Amino acid sequence: MTSQEHPNWLTALLVDTRPPPKLFAWSPANIQPKLDEGIDMGSSNSDEEYDNDACVCQSTDSDQRIYIIGPGNIGRLYATHMARHPNALPITLVVHRKELLSQWVACEGVGLADITSGKLFLNKGFTVEWWTETRPPYGPVKEVADGKKLHNVFISTKAEAGLAEADRIRRYLGRCSSVVFAQNGVCKLWPPHGPLYISHRYPSGDTPTFSACVVSHGVASAGPFLSVHAAPADAYIGPVFWASDPESPWRHPSDDFFIRHIATTPHVNTKQVSSGEIWLLQLEKLVMNAAINPLTALLRCKTGELFTSYGSDDPLALVIDKLLWQTSAVIQGLVDHKTSHSVITSYAEHMSQPGTSCSVPKVRKKLMERFSQPILKAKLGWEEDRDTGL
């Protein structure tokens, strides 16, 4: 692949030969030299549940700790319920602004209002850090993971910032690391660009496992460290890139500890799937992001309001149909492209019955139908036989 075929983000990283930066882990102690040991959490009632001890574990080693980078709505959802895991691990929330350290001190912790149960889950039992190249001028000086490797990393920033965050911390990533991207976007590490990026940024034999998590839960922000779980749904997690371990050649990405830990986290209904299936699920989520979400933002309405009119001459219906045709064409082009051969082959092998051979061309044809405009429209709740007028 020539440099002209590289996307801009990859070209910029390929020409970057600088070593990965050393990062300092600031804590609230670096903002306020002396903090009160106890923080008044107020009085609780029947609609509030406090989980201050849920994250307390004997070990604080980095190989046991979960690091949630970008604790926004999705990060807060998973942090809340990871803390309620039967085998809960210590959790560090990595914020993107220094000011959030002070806000953490002043707030009651991570709050998640569950609309279904009518409960407000509050948890102050997390460690909160801000990672920066700037050494703190006062307070304890601590490098990220004490200069060791991070094992369990959950990146829930906005999609466009996900890989940049992972690249910034690559000094602390290696073969022992499992990195999960949980965002409303397609992971950049799929072939053909992912393997090229990884071979450029990591030494051979010391590559992390990278996975993607597609989240369908409806979660809205209600303030710093506070979210509303408005629409419970489900989620899927699967591997994007993993390197075979010469010491354990029989190991499969489904054996990854962190993937299994997320899949067994209560109340978020996260299903573990194959690499090919998570690729397809990300593409399906892309349909919502490309055709529906921009319209709800532009028209300042809820998703359901887009489907109140089914008339063939309705201007909004025509716009949505046009967007779906364009989105379908792009995704079908990707499915049919030679660079997608490896992931489609992996998906075909996973879907084939034991003892039978898989037909990649047949699987590719079915996937082309899966992402056709009529099927996409049906999945969005529209009538397939409606005249589009296009």
UniProtKB/Swiss-Prot annotation:
Domain of life of the native organism: Eukaryota
EC number: 1.2.7.-
Keywords: NADP, Oxidoreductase
GO molecular function ontology, one term from the record: NADP binding
Known catalytic reactions: (R)-2-hydroxy-3-methylbutanoate + NADP(+) = 3-methyl-2-oxobutanoate + NADPH + H(+)
Annotated thermal dependence: Optimum temperature is 35 degrees Celsius.
Organism: Gibberella intermedia (Bulb rot disease fungus)
SUPFAM superfamilies from the UniProt entry: 6-phosphogluconate dehydrogenase C-terminal domain-like
Transmembrane segments: none
InterPro entries linked to this entry: 6-PGluconate_DH-like_C_sf, 6PGD_dom2, Ketopantoate_reductase, KPA_reductase, KPR_N
Protein name listed in UniProt: Ketoisovalerate reductase BEA2
Assigned GO CC terms: mitochondrion
Binding sites annotated in the UniProt record for substrate: 289, 293
Job description of the protein: Ketoisovalerate reductase; part of the gene cluster that mediates the biosynthesis of beauvericin (BEA), a non-ribosomal cyclic hexadepsipeptide that shows antibiotic, antifungal, insecticidal, and cancer cell antiproliferative and antihaptotactic activity. Ketoisovalerate reductase BEA2 catalyzes the NADPH-specific reduction of ketoisovaleric acid to hydroxyisovalerate, a precursor for beauvericin biosynthesis.
